[in-house]
From Swiss-Prot:
The keyword Transferase does not apply. This is Uncharacterized protein YPL071C. Residues 1-12 have a biased composition (Polar residues). The keyword Phosphoprotein applies. Residues 1-27 are annotated as: Disordered. The modification Phosphoserine is found at residue 21. One of its GO terms (cellular component) is cytoplasm.
């Protein structure tokens, strides 16, 4: 039998699996950052990678995984709530997940793309038509209109 399994207290024939991690977001982000560090340290040189091993101190501090997904304010609030002695663990985790979910929710405005395309075409079309058929008073003057009778008798 594998050492990762443990026997149940009630039934000696019943095998109980080990518990999963309670923090899947932190584990996933830790693995992602660890993979990035490992990829940065890859080298084709004969000497090997730049660093012999990646430093975990940058990834974990006081058993809290620093992630890009958790905002600093939310993280500070989580740490503050976890150190205080008020409330049940279930309520605490519910508050954490609720705040993370609210922080990451996005409202996407629905847009009618057919209407936007039609209005864009309509504006373009009318701009094309109005630019061709405009009346420019200065450009349409005729030379004959400028002719002035210079033989006017001023003494009369």
């Amino acid at each position: 039998m594998s050492s990762r399994f443990a026997r149940s207290n009630g039934n000696p024939n019943h095998i109980r699996k080990r518990n999963h991690s309670p923090d899947p977001i932190g584990i996933d982000n830790y693995k992602r950052k660890r993979l990035i560090i490992d990829l940065e340290n890859l080298s084709l040189n004969d000497k090997g990678p730049k660093n012999g091993h990646a430093d975990d101190n940058n990834l974990i501090h006081n058993n809290i995984v620093f992630t890009d997904a958790i905002d600093d304010k939310v993280l500070k609030e989580i740490i503050k709530c976890s150190t205080s002695k008020r409330g049940d663990n279930d309520l605490f985790y519910d508050k954490i997940w609720e705040r993370l979910r609210e922080k990451r929710l996005q409202i996407i405005k629905w847009v009618d793309y057919k209407e936007i395309a039609y209005l864009s075409w309509w504006k373009w079309f009318h701009n094309q038509m109005t630019s061709k058929y405009t009346y420019d008073g200065e450009a349409d003057t005729d030379v004959e209109m400028m002719a002035v009778d210079t033989d006017v008798d001023m003494d009369a």
